[in-house]
């Protein structure tokens, strides 16, 4: 139980209660002529923040134990399960693949008992020319081959995959790439573009996992990334799905669960794992094509990074707070994209909607629980938007009162998706607030 009273928190929240520390050097501190405090035998090679000096073997054991402990403590992943491991070539992603390989090579008692299938989901066609895209694919495939796992290749938005040994991988999914590119070109704001990519990415993972008959999807998200995701979800209006977006297990789809076994690791541990691992591991930095643009996600990311420099416990505090949040369970069969549906159908008006009297319970796009009905928060947002567009100084007092009554009615109808024509009304009924914003922001032809 927290011992800090509510009165201790003013307008600045709990920031004033956090001890500000001078910026620490990046990574752990390499030390000399010290003995490892774990084994008391080998020479220490590093000292992580607030940790004792460690030798190379003890450090690798410590990091790998955190990975295995997250899987063992929850007992969600069953023995012998076929697991789809998502690959993108990032440092934390390469570390996860090496940990999986190391676990499979252990003796019977310590062996990681899963059947991994690696899937490389290409996204580099966004914001790059064909030559740059092909070069990026070749580079990442070369990194992937160092692990020796059975591996497949696909792209963002696709629903099928091919072996990485096939020729001309970058040219196999031109149609799927064009669909994603067309939608992104039609979305006006960078915030909605980035949100669309995140939601489509999850949809792609689940579609490929179903094709490969995998019940679990391993992602390499670490604590820093998940802390940023938590705050970004708040700013985007995805509070209903926030808990599952950062949880160890996202079980919105009970047949294909998303697992985040790297969530307890931090960037320093990733950096030094790559340095001290038995095998020389190659990785690449993931380049976000919209990183230098203005968006809610980019602003949140910079805010967290900046606060972390002065208050090193920021990420841990935000991340662990998210662990205390709950999420509503919705049956998988309710209102999600069917096998023959595709994300693009939401934007090209070809999605088939079933008109029925039942209230939808799950978002058609992101599959989070719907909670917009009679929402006072959304009502205030829509009403404020209407006041800005409809009220002007030339209106009389009586006209303002009459207009206010109409705006209240219209705002309520907008929140409950009752104001538009039949087709748009039915579509908005089946989307959460954040996914509605993506659709509203889309003006593609």
Curated annotation (Swiss-Prot):
<comment type="pathway">
    <text>tRNA modification; 5-methoxycarbonylmethyl-2-thiouridine-tRNA biosynthesis.</text>
</comment>
<dbReference type="Pfam" id="PF10288">
    <property type="entry name" value="CTU2"/>
</dbReference>
<keyword id="KW-0819">tRNA processing</keyword>
<dbReference type="GO" id="GO:0005829">
    <property type="term" value="C:cytosol"/>
</dbReference>
<comment type="function">
    <text>Plays a central role in 2-thiolation of mcm(5)S(2)U at tRNA wobble positions of tRNA(Lys), tRNA(Glu) and tRNA(Gln). May act by forming a heterodimer with NCS6/CTU1 that ligates sulfur from thiocarboxylated URM1 onto the uridine of tRNAs at wobble position.</text>
</comment>
<dbReference type="GO" id="GO:0016779">
    <property type="term" value="F:nucleotidyltransferase activity"/>
</dbReference>
<feature type="compositionally biased region" description="Acidic residues">
    <location>
        <begin position="1"/>
        <end position="11"/>
    </location>
</feature>
<keyword id="KW-0963">Cytoplasm</keyword>
<protein>
    <recommendedName>
        <fullName>Cytoplasmic tRNA 2-thiolation protein 2</fullName>
    </recommendedName>
</protein>
<dbReference type="GO" id="GO:0016783">
    <property type="term" value="F:sulfurtransferase activity"/>
</dbReference>
<feature type="region of interest" description="Disordered">
    <location>
        <begin position="1"/>
        <end position="26"/>
    </location>
</feature>
<dbReference type="InterPro" id="IPR019407">
    <property type="entry name" value="CTU2"/>
</dbReference>
<dbReference type="GO" id="GO:0034227">
    <property type="term" value="P:tRNA thio-modification"/>
</dbReference>
<dbReference type="InterPro" id="IPR014729">
    <property type="entry name" value="Rossmann-like_a/b/a_fold"/>
</dbReference>
<dbReference type="GO" id="GO:0002143">
    <property type="term" value="P:tRNA wobble position uridine thiolation"/>
</dbReference>
<dbReference type="GO" id="GO:0032447">
    <property type="term" value="P:protein urmylation"/>
</dbReference>
<dbReference type="GO" id="GO:0000049">
    <property type="term" value="F:tRNA binding"/>
</dbReference>
<comment type="similarity">
    <text>Belongs to the CTU2/NCS2 family.</text>
</comment>
<dbReference type="GO" id="GO:0002098">
    <property type="term" value="P:tRNA wobble uridine modification"/>
</dbReference>
<feature type="compositionally biased region" description="Basic and acidic residues">
    <location>
        <begin position="13"/>
        <end position="22"/>
    </location>
</feature>
